[in-house]
Amino acid sequence: TICTGADRPCAACCPCCPGTSCQGPEPNGVSYCRND
């Protein structure tokens, strides 16, 4: 399956890649996958 890499916006289609998790929202209102 396709996963969302670190420092990319969290996408409903695709979980964050292993070792990262969805964090946010940031000041721009977007949540990003970040390294754990």
Swiss-Prot record:
Molecular-function GO terms, alphabetical: potassium channel regulator activity; toxin activity
Disulfide bridges in this chain: C3-C17, C10-C22, C13-C14, C16-C33
The entry's keywords: Calcium-activated potassium channel impairing toxin, Disulfide bond, Ion channel impairing toxin, Knottin, Neurotoxin, Potassium channel impairing toxin, Secreted, Toxin
SUPFAM superfamilies assigned to the protein according to its UniProt record, in alphabetical order: omega toxin-like
Keyword Secreted: yes
Localization, UniProt: Secreted
Site note Important for the neurotoxic activity, residues: I2, V30
Coiled-coil regions listed: none
GO cellular component, one term: extracellular region
Family the entry assigns: Belongs to the neurotoxin 11 (kappa toxin) family.
Domain statement: The presence of a 'disulfide through disulfide knot' structurally defines this protein as a knottin.
Protein name: Lambda-hexatoxin-Hv1b
Species for this entry: Hadronyche versuta
